Design a protein with these regions (language model features):
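Structural signature of extracellular appendage/secretion-system components
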Residues: 1-298
Length: 298
């Protein structure tokens, strides 16, 4: 009777284990049990092969199950559900799939190329460039579907970051509009459009103060560059060059974990650029059209 009780308890534990991971168990002739999990022995007769955890990568603090002896526990990929490959069983895999392998941002969501971005000054389409951009987009979609979409956490995180990025850049670009400037050597840079940009209501008439700032990257760098005047002669001008977002530099992105409300505006709200700039042609006071523009975009 005791032996049967032990056997029942063992079988119950095996049933519980099978809800966590996909296992196969075999009873040996001597009554011991061997357990096979994810292509390897978890229990080989009376020899137990233990699991532990390790970081997903050198840059991630997320944990994954690994064998103490070395090697990943899930050899056939954690971000996949497939009855054909027998990777649709077990709550542990389900949790790992839902969590994902890494943090995501708006950059992980593929952006379909806009045909209008590939038109020249005469309205002719650069078919080759547009085709290459479309091919790259399709490649990124496949990558997204394989590495991000299966994870609900990674998907929501990327979509939320895209929303935050869109709001932050929309507000900032309205308060601090930019323009392209051609330099004397023919290259172009992006600078603050000081003719159209509104100014603050403070004594210094602050210009170019964005509402949402990147913690490690300022919006502009003040510098002197050389341009050509109306007569084609070089002349130096002082500009506020926009510090572009760099996909390879996380600290340069308008992404959720890098954003904060401009501390300078919190200290002195009068610096928020909502007043008319004399160069813009607007009368003194608040730029009503700017406020209406913000509301329309919102």
């Amino acid at each position: 009777e005791s032996a049967n009780d032990y056997r029942d308890s063992r079988n119950l534990l095996l049933d519980q284990l099978s809800t966590y991971v996909n296992v196969e168990s075999y009873e040996e002739v001597d009554g011991t049990v061997s357990i096979y999990a994810e292509g390897q022995f978890l229990l080989e007769s009376n020899v137990q092969h233990r699991l532990t955890t390790a970081n997903e990568s050198e840059t991630s603090k997320l944990l994954k199950p690994v064998w103490e002896m070395g090697g990943d526990f899930f050899l056939r990929g954690e971000l996949s559900y497939s009855s054909e490959n027998d990777t649709d069983t077990g709550s542990l895999r389900g949790l790992l799939v839902a969590r994902g392998k890494s943090k995501t941002t708006y950059l992980d969501i593929p952006q379909k190329p806009d045909e209008s971005d590939y038109l020249d000054a005469d309205g002719n389409l650069d078919s080759k460039a547009y085709f290459n951009a479309t091919e790259e987009y399709n490649r990124k979609v496949e990558e997204y579907n394989e590495n991000v979409q299966p994870s609900i956490v990674m998907t929501i995180e990327a979509e939320f970051d895209q929303l935050i990025h869109g709001i932050a850049t929309m507000v900032n670009d309205t308060l601090c509009p930019n323009k392209k400037l051609t330099l004397a050597d023919g290259t172009t840079i992006t600078v603050l459009d000081t003719d159209k940009a509104p100014i603050g209501d403070d004594a210094d008439k602050t210009i170019g103060a964005e509402l949402f700032v990147r913690r490690e990257t300022s919006r502009y760098t003040e510098k002197t560059v050389t341009v050509l005047d109306d007569d084609g002669k070089p002349k130096p001008v002082t500009v506020y060059q926009y510090n572009e977002e760099n996909p390879n530099d996380h600290y340069s992105l308008y992404t959720t974990d890098q954003l904060e409300v401009n501390p300078e505006l919190l200290r002195d709200p009068s610096k928020l650029p909502l007043s008319a700039n004399a160069s813009s042609g607007h009368v003194d006071g608040y730029t009503l059209d700017l406020c209406q523009d913000l509301l329309a975009k919102w």
